A protein has these predicted regions:
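Catalytic alpha/beta active-site cores
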Residues: 1-106, 131, 137-141, 169, ...
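Glycine-rich beta-alpha junction loops
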Residues: 57, 121, 182
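Short glycine/threonine-rich loop-to-helix capping motif typified by GTGT followed
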Residues: 63-69, 104-116, 145-158, 185-193
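Short, well-ordered amphipathic alpha-helical segments that serve as non-catalytic structural scaffolds
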Residues: 79-82, 120-124
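Short, acidic/polar
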Residues: 158-165
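Active-site or pore-adjacent capping/gating segments
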Residues: 163, 174-205
Length: 205
């Protein structure tokens, strides 16, 4: 029979693509497509995410946490402004956003980054929707960054990824991806990345 509820994530991310790859075709067409997609799926977007604000490339380029937060808010504001122009209700749109952060090995700064972002998110929503009484926390996905990785002693990257993973968890992320410590064909790199997650989840208190 017909399904009344769809569970999926589209994660529309044009701004992140333009910023990461230097594409010069930035225009309003993609936002028009996004607005059209919203209206077509409106009523079926329960527990789904339509927009992904992906700032992992900033972390992988070595930018500091303040710069990452500023750019995240700038990107989010751009989406809000463009969708508001196209009559998309922001009180519904804010529930459809997910955020993806790269997490470095600066332990306390990365914890603070995620916690600060939750406060900034609430302030941003209040600025756009001052009458909104209840604001949910943003959904945050984290990926351990590779900016501090070394190729001369690759196994030391295990310490960096573990530290970054702990920061993400203590900062309050919802989803965590641990990047393998090596891209040089190390057979157990993916397994060790999985083990880091399992140890932090099941054996750490």
């Amino acid at each position: 029979g017909e399904r009344d509820r769809l569970l999926f994530g589209i994660e529309f991310v044009p701004i992140g693509y333009w910023q990461q790859y230097g594409n010069d075709t930035y225009n309003g067409t993609m936002f028009a497509h996004l607005a059209d997609l919203f209206f077509r799926l409106s009523g079926h977007l329960h527990d789904c995410k339509l927009i992904k604000i992906d700032t992992t490339h900033f972390a992988n380029q070595g930018e500091d946490v303040v710069s990452q937060l500023v750019k995240t808010l700038q990107i989010t504001s751009t989406y809000f402004d463009e969708m508001e122009k196209r009559n998309v209700p922001l009180e519904e749109l804010v529930q459809l956003c997910t955020f993806r952060f790269g997490i470095g090995s600066n332990f306390f700064f990365e914890i603070a980054k995620l916690r600060a972002f939750k406060i900034l998110w609430h302030n941003l929503i209040k600025a756009y929707l001052p009458e909104m009484d209840f604001i949910t926390n943003p959904e945050i996905h984290c990926v351990t960054a590779t900016a501090s990785f070394t190729q001369t002693d690759e196994h030391s990257n295990l310490l960096r990824t573990t530290t970054a993973a702990m920061s993400a968890i203590l900062g309050g992320c919802d989803v965590l991806i641990v990047t393998p410590f090596s891209n040089s064909g190390e057979n157990n790199a993916i397994q060790l990345a999985t083990n880091i997650q399992n140890i932090l989840r099941y054996e750490s208190y």
